[in-house]
Swiss-Prot record:
This is Large ribosomal subunit protein bL33B. Pfam families: Ribosomal_L33. One of its GO terms (molecular function) is structural constituent of ribosome. The lineage of its organism: Bacteria, Bacillati, Cyanobacteriota, Cyanophyceae, Synechococcales. GO terms for biological process: translation.
Length: 66
């Protein structure tokens, strides 16, 4: 019998401030992204975490993207 997929899924977190920041504010080009897992049963809404953004060189809000 095949194993079920389970309730944990892999999600990508993207910096919310990198898209609106100008080139002068950024240390390097691009958008900061992290991958993590979340429990589908406990967290139905999109995940939001404060993570370090290497492009802006500070802690920023990272949101789950599709």
């Amino acid at each position: 019998m095949a194993k079920s997929k389970g309730v944990r899924i892999i999600v990508t977190l993207e910096c919310t401030e990198c898209r609106t920041a100008t080139a002068a504010e950024k240390r390097s080009p691009g958008v900061s992204r992290y991958t993590t897992t979340k429990n589908r049963r406990n967290n139905l809404e999109r995940l939001e975490l404060m993570k370090f953004c290497p492009q802006l060189n500070r802690m920023t809000l990272h949101r789950e993207i599709k």
